[in-house]
Amino acid sequence: MTDGAPRTFLNPTSAELVEIALQRGEGRLTANGALVALTGARTGRSPADRFIVKEPSSEADIEWGPVNKPFDAGAFDALWGRVEAYLSEKELFVSELEVGADDEHYLPVRVTTEYAWHQLFARNLFITPEHFNRGDKGVWQIINAPGFVCDPSRDGTHSDAVVILNFAERKVLLAGLKYAGEMKKSMFSVQNFLLPAKGVLPMHCSANVGQDGDTTLFFGLSGTGKTTLSADPKRFLIGDDEHGWAKGGVFNIEGGCYAKCIDLSQKNEPVIWDAIRFGTVLENVMLDENRVPNYKDSSLTENSRAAYPLEHIAQRKVENRGNEPHAVVFLTCDVSGVLPPVSILTKEQAAYHFLSGYTAKVGSTEMGSTSAIQSTFSTCFGAPFFPRPAGVYAELLIERIESFNSQVYLVNTGWTGGPHGVGKRFDIPTTRAIVDAIVSGSLKDAPTEHLATLNLAVPLAIEGVDSTLLNPINTWADKDMYAKYAKQLAQEFNSNFAKYQVSEAIKQAGPKA
């Protein structure tokens, strides 16, 4: 650069970024060595401010609506230019990274940030390659300018901040927001659009593998247990949130983890606890007077986070990929207290529950959500991140399950014995015992009983689990009230599913109101 021009740091190290972030006052060093940063008013994603540029190359393949909102191509170019001009006067951080741990399906990404801690986040969450863009692909660009204030009347945005994806130009623009999760979810959305065209199923799931190479997937919305359950001391982690399932195997889309921190404990989540050290970014975590993180403090948000590279986990799959999965787990957090802790699904039921995506928003990751826990249906267990119509992903899932003969399970990490506020939530040790039975294969052909209203098969016994918990009616003091709530939930499933054009076999696989 010319003399006097602001510096640009290319591929800076974690130590450099921590040092600069502290010098600039972007964050504080904690007692465990992590860097804690605050994101201001926006402590979660801002779905109302997320757009996709409407242009000929992708327009026909995107399901436009409240999730995927169109943005004018000319307005995007003008705004990109304004943000670039703003950043030209700033000290910048640039890294050459990749998204997708697969030689065929990776995307090269050049990430430019105004903040040092945002660059540390990107380097933790994306993949640092030995040789950047070895396949000479078109390079994606992310620019993240939290200090740029959007003007809706000038820029065509919804507010003072914006997230825009542009498939034709391979660009992601983030302006006016500090919440770092927008960066990772933007590139997830990009891969969710591109991978299906190559016959690869992109998934909002975690994945781990056993000593014998047996892979398990955990689908679920934020707060349902993806990160916690995949961080198993007895198994090797592939990744905690974003994966692709191609013919022959599963690969991580990322190079790090973005774990929820609320109520984190060393006893229940030792793998995550030990990963939080120097180089980790703690987002919106409160500290005590000795700089010790207080993970119980939700005064800023329920959505406090830790972003760390996979290298911080001792028991990980170094290749960042695994075999095709023998077991697939759909995690649901049922606030009604009606669903059993585990059900064994047929292929048709798997398609039904994948499309339904029934769960709860727990410590919601989205701005504008109340702190109250509420039930929701989120297609593919990740509706905010999937640009194509839901049927595209469901068809790919059925195809992959059938070709590899994977067994799918529905696991409730929510409530039993009554709805939220009356019943109690399944504890982590109980769910871990269920998952142990799933990954061992002992549940696949276990004797079951059929729950008529829910149309689900539940095992009669699981080692290490109180058998009275397995049929949820046993945990309710008032059996008539259980029947009422079960019927009500079945009706909610049916009315939500009415919008899908699917085979009669899949329609009949749902609850019977």
Swiss-Prot record:
Its EC number is 4.1.1.49. One of its GO terms (molecular function) is ATP binding. PROSITE patterns: PEPCK_ATP (PS00532). Its cofactor is Mn(2+). One of its GO terms (biological process) is gluconeogenesis. It catalyses: oxaloacetate + ATP = phosphoenolpyruvate + ADP + CO2. Its main location: cytoplasm. Keywords: ATP-binding, Cytoplasm, Decarboxylase, Gluconeogenesis, Lyase, Manganese, Metal-binding, Nucleotide-binding. One of its GO terms (cellular component) is cytosol. Binds 1 Mn(2+) ion per subunit. It is found in: Cytoplasm. ATP binds at residues 185, 204, 220-228, 269, 305, 431. Substrate binds at residues 45, 179, 185, 305. Pathway: Carbohydrate biosynthesis; gluconeogenesis. The keyword Lyase applies. Mn(2+) binds at residues 185, 204, 241. InterPro entries: PEP_carboxykinase_ATP, PEP_carboxykinase_C, PEP_carboxykinase_N, PEPCK_ATP_CS. Coiled coil: none annotated. Pfam families: PEPCK_ATP. Belongs to the phosphoenolpyruvate carboxykinase (ATP) family. Monomer. Involved in the gluconeogenesis. Catalyzes the conversion of oxaloacetate (OAA) to phosphoenolpyruvate (PEP) through direct phosphoryl transfer between the nucleoside triphosphate and OAA. HAMAP family: PEPCK_ATP (MF_00453). This is Phosphoenolpyruvate carboxykinase (ATP). It comes from Shewanella denitrificans (strain OS217 / ATCC BAA-1090 / DSM 15013).
